[in-house]
Amino acid sequence: MSGPEVELVLGKIFERAIETKKRVGQIYRQFARLFSHVPEVEDFWRKMNINQNTHADWLKETKESLSEEQMLSLPEVELVLKMHSIKNLFDKHSKKEIGNLHDAYEVAHELEFSEVNDLFKILTSQFVSCEKKKNLILSEIDEHRKQIKNLPEKFESEMKEIKVEGG
């Protein structure tokens, strides 16, 4: 199989989802560097980066458990549409300048509550066979989102005052 059809197989969707989680992790790692002068904030972003890499590992394990027939099967249209939305989301955020913690929070909030985690949830729900592991992964996503939502409360009025290092 060659050409555009290759992009439409389930295996490619998994590969892109893995790349997406790693890319989000890189964004969070960059945030940790930008806020390295505020240890609590740096630690928050460092942990978020680790979580994203764990998600990528889970997706990789799930992909490796699929049969060749599954890997070459056509994915649901919803998965393909989510991949296109994710590309647009990254294009949008690649141009955004981060000047303070509030800017970083806005990017992270949009990523965590976007197609990035929607796609992760769908792939987990449909292809992780162990119910215990599936529930763990899905609860991890919810916990991750809660951590992002609670960031403004944690730093209250400091969100715009905590500038990037050198900013």
Named regions from a protein language model:
Residues 1-167:
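Non-heme di-metal
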